[in-house]
């Protein structure tokens, strides 16, 4: 990456391309790139990974559009007279991108998300949560419904028999209608500090980058710039 550029951005871009192959097919080409012995070989597999990543981006956008259409019809509406406090969507999504869909919807609507792919005989689900909810402990309350289950407080994945999906949906809607009864979804942006625009310089960028790697448990710092106008 160029001097002064964000290490987080660089890591994300590289990771997206390495992960895209495994999401849509298998990760062999990613491994071949990492094991390349010369620039010609590396360029060959880098182009393949870039194609996979573009395909992943297109499929992800299409799938999120489909999921949001479903939200408009059902998931954000009243269910059995109660406000629904969870996004729960099933469909013929590619299993490799259901986590990306769940992340996007949780980020947008500030609600726990469960996205289930029903492409195979055993359905696969991916969940993303909000700070108020320990999603893995919540799912463990209904452990008998799953074939397999794993994760952590912020995200989880599972496999489930199709006939158990309606039961899971009913149980989760009931659970969250009680546990999040007073929760009002909002896309609140939390900032770590106010900053003057004059503080945006190479020295401070390097200091921030020295705190990486960023991710769950070590989020990238968020700064507030007041009275700043952005022109296109």
Predicted regions located by residue number:
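A generic structural signal for short, non-catalytic loop/turn and secondary-structure boundary residues
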Residues: 5, 81-82, 151, 184-186, ...
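A contiguous loop/helix-start segment that scaffolds small-molecule binding in enzyme catalytic cores
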Residues: 175-232
């Amino acid at each position: 990456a160029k001097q002064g550029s964000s290490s987080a951005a660089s890591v994300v871009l590289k990771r997206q391309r390495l992960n895209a192959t495994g999401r849509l097919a298998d990760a062999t080409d990613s491994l071949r790139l990492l094991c390349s012995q010369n620039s010609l070989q590396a360029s060959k597999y880098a182009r393949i990974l870039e194609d996979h990543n573009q395909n992943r981006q297109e499929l992800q956008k299409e799938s999120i559009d489909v999921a949001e259409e479903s939200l408009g019809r059902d998931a954000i509406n009243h269910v059995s007279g109660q406000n629904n406090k969870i996004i729960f969507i099933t469909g013929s999504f590619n299993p490799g991108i259901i986590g990306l869909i769940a992340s996007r919807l949780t980020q947008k609507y500030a609600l726990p998300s469960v996205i289930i792919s029903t492409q195979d005989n055993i359905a696969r689900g991916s969940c993303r949560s909000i700070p108020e909810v320990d999603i893995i402990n919540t799912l463990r309350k209904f452990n008998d419904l799953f074939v397999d289950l794993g994760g952590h407080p912020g995200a989880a994945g599972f496999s489930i028999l199709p006939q158990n999906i309606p039961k899971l949906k009913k149980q989760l809607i009931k659970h969250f209608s009680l546990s999040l009864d007073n929760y009002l979804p909002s896309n609140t942006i939390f900032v770590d500090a106010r900053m003057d625009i004059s503080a945006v310089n190479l020295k401070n960028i390097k200091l921030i980058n020295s705190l990486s790697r960023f991710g769950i448990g070590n989020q990238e710092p968020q700064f507030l710039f007041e009275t700043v106008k952005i022109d296109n």
